[in-house]
């Protein structure tokens, strides 16, 4: 008896015996009407969800900020917020993250974001950096697309003092219509719409009103959302009389808003704690809720309806929910432009404008060796280059997206991911010596499959069950091209079953494609130089020491044989001991790569954000003139294209960084065939970053 009581006490204290996981989502409501709807939500979910399923509890607070604090303190679990409040929720000490997004439109084409744009008449002739002295049309004071975003981005161009903000804006434009502004204190903000009425009684109020202000000729520019012009002008010929102002001081047609906008603004979003936030449970609850009580599902209770108010718990105009990818934090979800605009307004900080003197370029380095080289570059550049570290290439891309870093050079596979994340190529590594290297369009390189000559029975057609060596998951020659070709043959993504073993850095640690890797401890199979079989040289070493086939570039074998690589594993290797697999089932000597390869691949390219494009281009061209291939003695001087190990920051065989001319988007740079091939392989992608970026830019 005493033992039994003791056991029960242990169970009670530790909570370990037959523990039932807490499947309750505590929803935060900010008014009596919201609390009433929350209780109805709770009761109706009980009637349709099994007893072991998710349930709702309601927590009432006085404001959204109180809800944010309650969730951070684990007194509540979820609340739906607009974009501005998502920014507040993300800031320390709250540290909340978006977990579920409302969508609008159809299930087939769900809209989770809108674009804030600056619309002008086609014949007006000015650019974004020439708005001073123009007449402006705004949806309303304090509204996202019509005020916060454009004024936030223009903040540093406003005349000082910038407080009060309304006065600075009034002095920047020659006249405005900013509904809801104080016309007595700031008459210039009401010059185009006398009275500045804060309702539809003011003909220039709201999205359609701001566009009408432009259309009528009262203003020169209207700050609205991307759909406004389509909602007000059904005829394409009429829409063609208008253009969008882009942040890089160019213009684009109104239907190119995805590539020419002030910011991408997310829809209303459910937020939760970043750690222990029940995000999967919240999604399970809301997914089941929309199945039972979504649009046109039930007359008893409707998630997206507010009989006793407007937009209670969720927006009445929402059509459903989408799960936010787990890789996406609030900064990525809101986007660099939006975060910059809001931070400028709240903190009075200024972004780097394209017309400013270029600030240092923050280069993203992977691994200890890359950081050492980057630091040496930084010292030699006399402050033109600064260094930022990240564990993986995808982490670097994310840092560039959110402004923590500015640039890095990427393999074509990662140029694709970076492009999907909104980054742009700015210069290409060129590996061919010529009299005018910087102006010579790069020709690309060949992706090849290398085997040992002694394995004479091995061909492209009988690779199943063999041991494979890859540069890294997601890279061009080592993964995208060979796996894309294999996918077309086997019609599934289980490459870890196709090969018996392999080393494909970036694979899941328990995958057979990590079994051949040589990294120790946590560095095993990591997609950086801490894994000895990472990259071109690493994949070839994997073949030399353990594998049957290596997927690399055509220069890899000659660069690591004949004594060119002095490392102990490579110094005695002979190029003649290796052969290439051809797609027709034959084999050829290594030097015949032009007639025996898997595909031609795009050269590595430097990527950056659109707002840094001009500065990165300018500074890198200066840097290569100082430290490029014209430096002959690298023993006593810093050389940009030489490495203590292999291919640090840039490929070691880079001759120069070449201009892209008109190939300044990832699609144009990579080419239609490569983009299509990588797109087909996306269904096999394990890239959490690609998933997140595709959510933002479908």
From Swiss-Prot:
It comes from the Eukaryota. Disulfide bonds join 28-67, 38-58, 137-213, 156-350, 177-193, 180-198, 190-196, 246-260, 358-615, 364-396, 374-387, 421-693, 437-656, 469-542, 493-684, 503-517, 514-525, 582-596, 634-639. SUPFAM superfamilies: Periplasmic binding protein-like II (SSF53850). Fe(3+) 2 binds at residues 411, 445, 536, 604. It is found in: Secreted. Keywords: Disease variant, Disulfide bond, Glycoprotein, Ion transport, Iron, Iron transport, Metal-binding, Methylation, Phosphoprotein, Repeat, Secreted, Signal, Transport. InterPro entries: Serotransferrin_mammal, Transferrin, Transferrin-like_dom, Transferrin_Fe_BS. Transmembrane segments: none annotated. Residues 25-347, 361-683 form the Transferrin-like domain. The modification Phosphoserine is found at residues 389, 685. One of its GO terms (biological process) is positive regulation of proteasomal ubiquitin-dependent protein catabolic process. Residues 1-19 form the signal peptide. GO terms for molecular function: enzyme binding; ferric iron binding; ferrous iron binding; iron chaperone activity; transferrin receptor binding; transmembrane transporter binding. One of its GO terms (cellular component) is apical plasma membrane. Pfam families: Transferrin. The modification Dimethylated arginine is found at residue 42. Changing residue 671 to E: In allele TF*B2. Hydrogencarbonate 2 binds at residues 471, 475, 477-478. Hydrogencarbonate 1 binds at residues 139, 143, 145-146. Belongs to the transferrin family. Transferrins are iron binding transport proteins which can bind two Fe(3+) ions in association with the binding of an anion, usually bicarbonate. It is responsible for the transport of iron from sites of absorption and heme degradation to those of storage and utilization. Serum transferrin may also have a further role in stimulating cell proliferation. It is linked to Atransferrinemia: A rare autosomal recessive disorder characterized by abnormal synthesis of transferrin leading to iron overload and microcytic hypochromic anemia. Has a bilobed structure, each lobe binds a single Fe(3+) ion. Does not always bind 2 Fe(3+) ions. Monomer. Part of a complex composed of SLC40A1/ferroportin, TF/transferrin and HEPH/hephaestin that transfers iron from cells to transferrin. This is Serotransferrin. It comes from Homo sapiens (Human).
């Amino acid at each position: 008896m005493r033992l039994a009581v003791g056991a029960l006490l242990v169970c009670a204290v530790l909570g370990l015996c037959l523990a039932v996981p807490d499947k309750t989502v505590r929803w935060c409501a900010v008014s009596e009407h919201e609390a009433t709807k929350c209780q109805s939500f709770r009761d109706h979910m009980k009637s349709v969800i099994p007893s072991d399923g998710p349930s709702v509890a309601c927590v009432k607070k006085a404001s959204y900020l109180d809800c944010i604090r309650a969730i951070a303190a684990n007194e509540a679990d979820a609340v739906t917020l607009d974009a501005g409040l998502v920014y507040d929720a993300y800031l320390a000490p709250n540290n909340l993250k978006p977990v579920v997004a409302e969508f609008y439109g159809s299930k087939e084409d769900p809209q989770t974001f809108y674009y804030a744009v600056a619309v002008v008449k086609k014949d007006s002739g000015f650019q974004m950096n020439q708005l001073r002295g123009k007449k402006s049309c705004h949806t309303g004071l304090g509204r996202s697309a019509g005020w916060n975003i454009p004024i936030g981005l223009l903040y540093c161009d406003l005349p000082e003092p910038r407080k009060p903000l309304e006065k600075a804006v009034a002095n920047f434009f020659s006249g405005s219509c900013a509904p809801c502004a104080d016309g007595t204190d700031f008459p210039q903000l009401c010059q185009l719409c006398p009275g500045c009425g804060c309702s539809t009684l003011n003909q220039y109020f709201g999205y359609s009103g701001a566009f009408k202000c432009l259309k009528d000729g009262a203003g020169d520019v209207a700050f609205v959302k991307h759909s406004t012009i389509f909602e007000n002008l059904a005829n394409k010929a009429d829409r063609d009389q208008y253009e969008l102002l882009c942040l890089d001081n160019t213009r684009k047609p109104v239907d190119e808003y995805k590539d020419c906008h002030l910011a991408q603004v997310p829809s209303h979003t459910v937020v939760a704690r970043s750690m222990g936030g029940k995000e999967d449970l919240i999604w399970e609850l809301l997914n089941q809720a929309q199945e039972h009580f979504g649009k046109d599902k039930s007359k008893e209770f409707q998630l997206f309806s507010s009989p006793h108010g407007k937009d209670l718990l969720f927006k009445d105009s929402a059509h459903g929910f989408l799960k936010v990818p787990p890789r996406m934090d609030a900064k990525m979800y809101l986007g660099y432009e939006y975060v910059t605009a809001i931070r400028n307004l709240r903190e009075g900080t200024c972004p780097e404008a394209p017309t400013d003197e270029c600030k240092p370029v923050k280069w993203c380095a992977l691994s200890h060796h890359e950081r050492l080289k980057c630091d040496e570059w930084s010292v030699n550049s006399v402050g033109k280059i600064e260094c930022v570290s990240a564990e993986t290439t995808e982490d670097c891309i994310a840092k560039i997206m959110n402004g923590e870093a500015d640039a890095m050079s990427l393999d074509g596979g990662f140029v694709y991911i970076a492009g999907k994340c909104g980054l742009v190529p700015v210069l290409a590594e060129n590996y061919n010596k010529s009299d005018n290297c910087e102006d010579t369009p790069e020709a690309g390189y060949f992706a090849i499959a290398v085997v040992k000559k002694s394995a004479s029975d091995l061909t492209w057609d009988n690779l199943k069950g063999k041991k494979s060596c890859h540069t890294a998951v997601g890279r061009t020659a080592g993964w995208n091209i060979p796996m894309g070709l294999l996918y077309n043959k086997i019609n599934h993504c289980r490459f870890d079953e196709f090969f018996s073993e392999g080393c494909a850095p970036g694979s899941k640690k328990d995958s057979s494609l990590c079994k051949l890797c040589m990294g120790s401890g946590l560095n095993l199979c990591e997609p950086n130089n801490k894994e000895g079989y990472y990259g071109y040289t690493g994949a070839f070493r994997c073949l030399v020491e353990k594998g049957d086939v290596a997927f690399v570039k055509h220069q890899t074998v000659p660069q690591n044989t004949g004594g060119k690589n002095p490392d102990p594993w490579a110094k005695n290797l002979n190029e003649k001991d290796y052969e290439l697999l051809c797609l027709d089932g034959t084999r050829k000597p290594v030097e015949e790569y032009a007639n025996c390869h898997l595909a031609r691949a795009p050269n590595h390219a430097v990527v950056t954000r659109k707002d840094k494009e001009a500065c990165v281009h300018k500074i890198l061209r200066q840097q290569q003139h100082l430290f490029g291939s014209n430096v002959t003695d690298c023993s006593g001087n810093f050389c940009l294209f030489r490495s203590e190990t292999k291919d640090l920051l840039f490929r070691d065989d880079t001759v120069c960084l070449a201009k892209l001319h008109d190939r300044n988007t990832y699609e144009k740079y990579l080419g239609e065939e490569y983009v299509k091939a990588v797109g087909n392989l996306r269904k096999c992608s394990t890239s959490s970053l690609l998933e997140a970026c595709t959510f933002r830019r479908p």
